[in-house]
Amino acid sequence: MFESGAILIYLAEKSWKFYDKDQRTVINQWLMGQMAYIGPMLGQHHQFHHYNPGKSEFGEERYFKISEKIYKELDERLSFSKYLAAKNYTIADIATFPWIARHEWHDIGLKNFKNLTRWYEEISKRDSVKKGFAFMDKNEFPPKPY
């Protein structure tokens, strides 16, 4: 099995967790949005802005603007939904969180997005998230919003 979204769906179906049957259409929508839009665009922003600054002004500006738009869209969605796809934590949140966890690399200012910050802080407190951050480095933890 390959592809993170497919793996998350498989594990969720096997465990009966984070993938409520009555919410699957919306969960899949946000999961696919992460896989096709949020992840790739923030990944490009990482390449131009974080790893290779000064190499392409066009790339840096383009992906900064797209990343800022993503933050605004997520913040808007979270203004009327506790989590991205449902009232409960789902695989859509699991897939999206790691990209927002690198907010320090984005230089957008997570704290400027009230609802996205609330979502981020709530997920950061989950024991499984803390354990995941500490997997390779015992001192690693989700960065605080700034």
Segments (PLM) and residue ranges:
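GST-like domain detector, emphasizing the conserved glutathione-binding G-site
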Residues: 1-69, 75
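Residue-level signal for nonpolar/aromatic packing positions in well-ordered secondary structure
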Residues: 7, 27, 74, 93, ...
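GST superfamily/GST-like fold recognition
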Residues: 41-46, 84-112, 117-123, 130, ...
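Hydrophobic alpha-helical bundle segments that form small-molecule/ligand-binding pockets
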Residues: 74-85
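Terminal-tail/helix-coil boundary detector
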Residues: 134-146
